Amino acid sequence: MYKEFGIKEEVISLAEKINKDLLPIFDEIDKNCELNSLKVLKAFNKYNVSDMHFNSTTGYGYGDVGRDTIENIFSEVLGAEDSLVRGQFISGTHALTVALFAFLRPNDTMLSICGKPYDTLDEVIGIVDNDSSLKSYGVKYEQIDLINDDFDYDKIIDRVSKNDIKLIEIQRSRGYALRRSITLDKIEKVIKAIRSVNKNVIIMIDNCYGEFVDKVEPLALGADVMVGSLIKNLGGGIAPNGAYIAGKKELVKLAAERLTAPGLGKEVGPTMGINKYILQGLFMAPSVVASSLKTAIF
């Protein structure tokens, strides 16, 4: 069968051998996939998803039952108090920008404990000068670099214990850096360390590329809020655009009022026909993520 595509027998034999060697790892990925698929299915059942939720709204988008149901489902699946899931988010970077501008005020300090975030956030934060950056509004930025792909726990504890940090950002994915992605056990460890000296700092996870990779999401480990893109994992390759912010209710409210307007928040936002694709994408996402992981490991 493969010969007509120019694939040699020795390549096929090697691939079969590698597949056998990787079976234990693939089995673990399949277990995660099954668990996350059941989470999604349970949420769909809980909120009685039907074709009525595929309906489209235009204009202001008041009373969009599908949109509100999608946000309830995301909250259920991600373990969040509330969620903001919108096609009005252009990208993960846009959602992160909305979150940062929602949570931070002039003279607040943001601390990244994974070194410098994505390049696309350079001008958002003010690492690269921009008149619309957080820096231009008086928000201060600090970073603590990783050590051998792990957190610098001592330096983090020392800095956070001074109680003048408003928000800590953890970028789960490697992004454009050469480091490894941050595993959940390390995220759990650093959150516990932070909470041992500071109960009030906002811990925000950039969860892009991290959803459904493991059995739980960072909110279950003590993070306050997380942000991700529907163009990536949770969109399942089907959602045409959008992103989400999920976590504590008061933080999601702030983010919603930054995306729309104070006093409007989550009440508005036309979906213009994407509800069906977001729901389909989420339903398929555990399988799509599992396949992606297997391909990357292979």
Describe each model-derived feature in a short phrase.
Residues E81-V85, L230-K232:
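A short glycine/serine-rich beta->alpha loop
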Residues Y2-N19, L23, D30, V40-K46, ...:
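Conserved PLP-enzyme active-site core in the AAT-like
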Residues D51-Y60, E71, L84-G87:
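Flexible, gly/proline-biased loop segments at the beginnings
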Residues R67:
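N-terminal pre-P-loop "Q-motif" helix
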Residues F298:
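Glycan-recognition surfaces in beta-rich domains, encompassing non-catalytic CBMs
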Residues F74-G79, G87:
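Extended, compositionally biased flexible segments
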